[in-house]
């Protein structure tokens, strides 16, 4: 082989080596770039990892805070539920109280109506009692007047009886004085005896009438006292009802 051929081969070999070196340099540069990129990505990844760790810590802190807040919220919820239960119980008690108040108010209104009717009835009875009291008082006055009249009549009859008795005594004394007057005196004696008997009958009748009138007066006075007592009871009851009606309801 000639020297030119060897030189050509060497040149070709050198060129190949040069190209290989250039390729190696290019690969080296590319490898450096790749390394730089990898380092950059690694650094970036480390930053991201650190950031992720910080975020994880923050999330863990938030989770811990959230757990604490959740615990506090649960405690508040329990308190709220207890308060709601108390409020519900209070509302039920209030509704029951309102229902009881309504029933009580209805009963009070009914009692007031009944008291009003009783008051009106008592007022009517009071007026009737006053009217009857006036009538009875008049009857008592009339009865007393009749009793006075009868007592006067009894006194007159008693005087008449006394006079008749005296006349009988005088006639008996004069019986033996004159035989001529015997028949006349006997007739007078019979007449006076009849008057005496009649006077006695009238006196007894008058006495019975007086007794009846006295009983009537006694019964009438008792009736008047009864009506006075009833009127006082009615007046006291009316005053008591007026006092109760004027009192305010504290409940």
From Swiss-Prot:
Keyword Coiled coil applies: yes
SUPFAM superfamilies per the UniProt record, alphabetical: Tropomyosin (SSF57997)
Keyword annotations: Coiled coil, Repeat
Domain of life: Eukaryota
Tissues/organs with expression: Striated muscle specific.
Keyword Coiled coil on entry: yes
Ranges in a coiled coil: 1-251
Entry note about domains: The molecule is in a coiled coil structure that is formed by 2 polypeptide chains. The sequence exhibits a prominent seven-residues periodicity.
Family: Belongs to the tropomyosin family.
Subunit structure of this chain's protein: Homodimer.
Protein name: Tropomyosin-2
